[in-house]
């Protein structure tokens, strides 16, 4: 705990000592009677012992132990036969007792804020027997408070807000300080508040700590934040009291007390007449000293000749007024516009209307600049009609365009061929007259939508576009025909007058009054005895049987020509043939079998199925023939077949581990071939002139001579060979010797050459060389057998 001033502490200590000594009078000591005490079966007279009511001053800093009080028993005659002991809270550690006199002292500095009192127990013992002479009694040592704690603001520093323009006495915030001293003892914990910084704008209530405004109409736009320092002092603010301070930041919140104002009374902007609709012309902004919702604006055009041409709206983020175009501008029609624009706060505060008006106006002049515009057509769409029977070169209609600029340049016309790929139409470049360029067919394309281009003669880059919709009028140029391919059947047991088919017709033409078709049989079929036709007068006709009993064996198919006439002018007609098949039907008249050949084919297979089966058989035969041919080719001998190679065999293994074994054997006798040593190596960069040379037989020579000569010859070849590897590279050489009777296989001539060498001895080498003997011996004819 913090201590007060040194002088105050010394003064309080003297007072406490005076109180303690004055309380030691025996007449003032309270008595405590103990219960009767019995020992050895004999009653003992009841004794009593007394002690002070103890108080200890906190924060004692003296060098000697602080005297607390004195314990005394009635049985104590002062002869030293009684000793006193102390137990309980702080006994021996904080409080000690003189066992002879009963004086209690405090050995440590005490702090009431840590512990306000201590509960202890006193005991008087006979010094000789060490037995109690009085019952144990409990007492309390209370710590007396001193003003050693200053007030503290536990929630500081504070921040608060108050609306600007608030009246005097408006509550801002309440601050609270706490004092750890004893509130029930003196004025150590009684706090009062005062303001050290922030006057004359704010004040604080001394007892409650409520901060209030002290000046009226504080303006946020002038100063929006204040820093206050508040003091809390104990001892009711008297001299010698302890104090603590905290800071309070007060922010003035905004109210709508400032009207909007345009920084300029007039504005002027230039825009080209080609500016598209909805484009931004300009942005203007009225200034408002307020912030947030109090600065939100609404703009509107209140007057001027641009009403309906322009509009203005507010940008919610920037609070600017955005002027945009509503209709196209035309320099030739009007060169300038004047707008009267008003800006007003969206939400006005009724308390401050006297500071208004909360709106302002300005003038905006918009100058329209002339630009070179493309030609303009007199109509956005030209509908035209033409008959499909119209001849080439017929005039369909005319389009017209003009230059809207003051120069009024001549206009030339053309057709955008991307909209007329077939080039059905032409247009006169000067007059805009559209004519047909090809014969038209409504059934192919009933409507042609083409784009006409109009460009200035003096500036071809200025192009206007007009749209023409040409509708092709229909003429009766298509004959009627069956509406579908009919599959008509008649049962063998059909009765006369039975309807076997109902037919209808279609026509690609589209007459204005709709189609009307007339059906009849052709002249040569009018008197046939099998079928008749009935026109139903509703663009349909019915086919009926004339006799009963049809037999597939006699005739399985009937062809009935039908004559159809339309109602066009002139009318067109066509003859369509209806195919009627005779079928075997069940009791319900449902056809079961309609083909006479079904009685002939045993398995009921159609012609298509037979063709498919035949194709499969042929495919199998071709595959079998191909396999046989490939096998026969594989039996032909190959000169370089691995089984017929008489070189030394190379045995390869794929085993891993155990070191490396070189199994590629070679015949050392081959090194004895002197010819291999003496012959120069074939140059890689020179084309050989002779493809084959027979090798003569050489006699045997010593091995050391063979190796020396072989290495010497190969060294000279490597020195003069332009294609040889680098100098420090590894050279590998091998040649065939004369140890074999047949010499090297490389000396064998091709079977196609005219060699007369005799290889009959190959037959004596055994079964492994049988094939080689057949190839080069007398039996080589078998190679081609």
UniProtKB/Swiss-Prot annotation:
Q: Which residues form the propeptide?
A: 28-47
Where in or outside the cell is it found? Cell membrane
| Membrane topology reported for the UniProt record | Single-pass type I membrane protein
- Chain ranges passing through the membrane: 608-628
| SUPFAM superfamilies linked | Cadherin-like
UniProt function note: Cadherins are calcium-dependent cell adhesion proteins. They preferentially interact with themselves in a homophilic manner in connecting cells; cadherins may thus contribute to the sorting of heterogeneous cell types.
Q: Which organism is it from?
A: Mus musculus (Mouse)
The protein's matches in SMART domains, at most eight in alphabetical order, are given as:
CA (SM00112)
Q: What is this protein called?
A: Cadherin-7
Sugar attachment sites are: 449, 530
**What's a GO biological-process term for it?**
homophilic cell adhesion via plasma membrane adhesion molecules
Q: Keywords on this record? A: Calcium, Cell adhesion, Cell membrane, Cleavage on pair of basic residues, Glycoprotein, Membrane, Metal-binding, Repeat, Signal, Transmembrane, Transmembrane helix
The record's PROSITE patterns line, in alphabetical order, gives: CADHERIN_1 (PS00232), CADHERIN_2 (PS50268)
Outline which residue ranges sit on the Extracellular face. 28-607
